[in-house]
Amino acid sequence: MDKPFNHLIICLTFVMPVAALSGCSGPNDSPEQDAVMSISSCTARGDDGQEMSVSEFGMFVTDTAGNLYPDNIRVLNRSGKWTFAEISLSDGDKGIYAYYPYSPSFSGGKMGLDARSQTDYLYSERTMVSGNAPSASITLYHLLSKVTFRMPAAVTAVRVADYSYSASYSLLTGSLEIKPEKGTISSGTGSLLLYPGDSPAMHVALVAG
């Protein structure tokens, strides 16, 4: 896979609630028993280095043995506070795989991709966390390659026909599977987002306005 040209960083900070001093604690109590995840900040940086807001993203989580939890976790920013289904760290280490944008249709640690939408899909590699080391910094990489065309002023769009637009990306294995369905992709920005790797020759059409 081509090396990503930019990245977005999501910092996850895990905090442990403070137990009330009510005389209920015992010698077997430990901080890990109450460890839960919280997110302190989430920022995205564009090509120009400027920060962009990210209102939501998705996460898949694995247990200590590497087994995938069934939940496709949606993370939302509500009035400046990140909210999502609670994830406990008391039962062992966890592996985190984050992606953007969130989609409820994703399952099994896989992202369904469609190049016709020209969505800037982002993914992360695995980050391990535990009750003893609960803080994680996650880097999201661009999954698609950005190809920019220098066009005359009269050209308002770039179009590629007969392109294999459908694909699946496994966050757990890092493998990209391009499917045989073909169609037309286009963009009015002078750039196209394409799947990385070797591709057959493509016919690029410049569309005048």
Indicate residue ranges for each PLM-predicted region.
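Sec-dependent bacterial lipoprotein signal peptides
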Residues: 1-22
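Short, low-hydrophobicity acidic/polar segments
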Residues: 24-165, 181, 188-209
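Short aromatic-acidic-glycine turn motif
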Residues: 164-174
